[in-house]
């Protein structure tokens, strides 16, 4: 465990050092007195801002194809930064882009700042992207210096992913069940990044806690492990002196994250699945002021033809009595303004997020409601001669859902419901195997989590390739041609065959240039010393014997 060196002194005893808090970990009392809360931000809003910033980093990094370690590192930077600064001073989306930009360089998966900003622009609306100012790149670059000074240049961060895979290899039992447990625990780690667990506990303890939670939900009790005789519980071989209460507290914090999504799911599904019924009650709200639309319609009817009026009467008989006037689309703007204004007033008076989410959820999925309006256009087109005038009005009705956020005085209070929709699919080259970006925070993910809690054999994806060692495959044996029958592998190879112009005896005699025995020996004089042949003068020199001393000196 890394200790806080700033707060420790040499005089502190070893017993006190064991209880010294790590430099990047706080208790719940400290988390209740963050700079944001000291400036008047309530804890629920701060938790929502942290969740939205983490999901923003997760979604941007996933679309850019970054590794899960890079995403987790950026989110850890994000949480640590706001332990020293307030959300009111530093917008969360600019900080999230800066943290992802720095994490990419630290984890050796860098991305250009303009690419991060471009991806952020595709995820945020105009009001949310307005936090980046006129020069988004300059905003990120300036904030990077503040981020580095805030985290004290402590850039290396460990994550529960590596410990989760390491611990899973030490478990014994059914491999399929262990694989399901690891897959589920991996998803819990992804979702735990949206909480402050990384500011409370080490990654080793979080890895054990998510395995404990996954085992409880999968109804898989870990009974066999490698060091079972030495330890009473399976997690004691990985982390010691961790009681069950700590694991239970971590599990409850993760489940509380899903309980918030469960409360908002009933408001989220009707907007997507039951869009036509939601369009019908809208004209019912202003039934009292129907006289105003009727006056507007009467004012617009004189320049029209009688055929148009007859067509309108036919539509009124064919359709429900709730939709008798298809033309009051201009007054419909005033109706929506009346409906939106009380919501804004309620939001100004009630800071908790639940009243905001139903309204915001309709801003992000504009694609599903784009299909019902074409069903309503055909009855209006034959009835009205000026279809071009009605078309833009109805198309403007769709962006009207996005108009309320700009009217809001505080743009920070208009976040996208990122935690309540599944992240975008990663590119094909992102991971070969399990999708490491899975989450139970979306509507579909929470339903699958509920089904897994009821059934014993849930369906999971494949494990990441690094979770278990791959099967050892013997190397392929090369198919050489069989040796000839007379081949002797122990016999030394023959000497290289030289060209025919160089005649070399096949087996030269031992020695250095010794003549053969039949060579006639030279004659030896009586003195015993063989005569020395005269030296051969170099070419162009006169014989030495013809030169005397006097001639040589000349």
From Swiss-Prot:
Residues 402-428, 466-542 have a biased composition (Pro residues). It comes from the Eukaryota. SUPFAM superfamilies: Cyclin-like. Ubiquitously expressed. Highest levels in testis. Present throughout the seminiferous epithelium. Also highly expressed in the developing oocyte. Disruption phenotype: Complete embryonic lethality. No homozygous embryos are detected at any stage of embryonic development. GO terms for biological process: cell division; DNA damage response; in utero embryonic development; negative regulation of stem cell differentiation; positive regulation of transcription elongation by RNA polymerase II; regulation of signal transduction. The modification Phosphoserine is found at residues 325, 329, 341. Residues 262-554 are annotated as: Disordered. The keyword Transcription regulation applies. InterPro entries: Cyclin-like_dom, Cyclin-like_sf, Cyclin/Ssn8, Cyclin_C-dom, Cyclin_N. It is found in: Nucleus. GO terms for molecular function: cyclin-dependent protein serine/threonine kinase activity; cyclin-dependent protein serine/threonine kinase regulator activity; protein kinase binding; RNA polymerase II CTD heptapeptide repeat kinase activity. Pfam families: Cyclin_N, CycT2-like_C. GO terms for cellular component: cyclin K-CDK12 complex; cyclin K-CDK13 complex; nucleus. Keywords: Cell cycle, Cell division, Cyclin, Mitosis, Nucleus, Phosphoprotein, Transcription, Transcription regulation. Residues 263-277, 287-322, 382-392, 429-446 have a biased composition (Low complexity). Disulfide bonds: none annotated. Regulatory subunit of cyclin-dependent kinases that mediates activation of target kinases. Plays a role in transcriptional regulation via its role in regulating the phosphorylation of the C-terminal domain (CTD) of the large subunit of RNA polymerase II (POLR2A). Regulatory subunit of cyclin-dependent kinases. Identified in a complex with a kinase and the RNA polymerase II holoenzyme. Interacts with POLR2A. Interacts with CDK12 and CDK13. Its interaction with CDK9 is controversial. Belongs to the cyclin family. Cyclin C subfamily. This is Cyclin-K. The gene is Ccnk.
